[in-house]
């Protein structure tokens, strides 16, 4: 609920949410939402091309997509894709579509957030589908992954707090 309130998917029933001292309802909604790249706990992977899943509705910029893929450690998956960014995911619309694991799907959702290049990155339980080794790699590389963005990392695991600057 907190994330949905912050991103203006819900309006608060009481009180105000301020950004730089201004009630967020004062900002133009579409412009305000561009400030956030969110990976919700119940993210979706679409039966589209891999690059389209990362670009999420934008025209696929190959350089930006590849940067996001590298930052979330998806190069092994990418290297197995017969058509690279044009590889179809899932087999809903293509018999040759590639099925990916839960961990690969979670990293693809993270790549989508990185690709958006918003100033705020919000990750809700972003390591839930990852094995312990991949989870540890995300934690140790987190600052490199989000780079100069303000990041909000939501987790029920105390171990996720080790890499955080502020709790």
Q: What are these model-predicted stretches?
A:
Residues 6-7:
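Helix-to-loop junction immediately C-terminal to a conserved catalytic motif
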Residues 144-155, 161:
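Conserved catalytic loops of ABC-family nucleotide-binding domains
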Residues 121-125:
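Catalytic Walker B motif of ABC-type/P-loop ATPase nucleotide-binding domains
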């Amino acid at each position: 609920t907190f994330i949905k309130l912050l991103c203006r998917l819900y309006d608060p029933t009481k009180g105000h949410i301020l950004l730089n001292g201004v009630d967020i309802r004062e900002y133009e909604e579409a412009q305000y939402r561009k400030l956030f790249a969110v990976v919700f706990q119940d993210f979706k992977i679409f039966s589209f091309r891999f690059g389209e899943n990362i670009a999420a509705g934008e025209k696929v910029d190959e350089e930006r997509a590849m940067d996001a893929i590298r930052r979330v450690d998806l190069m092994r998956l990418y290297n197995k894709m017969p058509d690279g960014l044009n590889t179809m995911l899932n087999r809903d619309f293509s018999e040759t579509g590639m099925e990916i694991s839960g961990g690969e799907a979670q990293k693809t959702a993270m790549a989508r957030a990185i690709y958006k290049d918003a100033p705020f990155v919000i990750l809700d339980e972003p390591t839930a589908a990852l094995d312990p080794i991949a989870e540890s790699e995300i934690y140790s590389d987190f600052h490199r992954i989000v780079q100069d963005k303000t990041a909000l990392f939501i987790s029920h695991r105390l171990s996720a707090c080790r890499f955080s600057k502020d709790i």
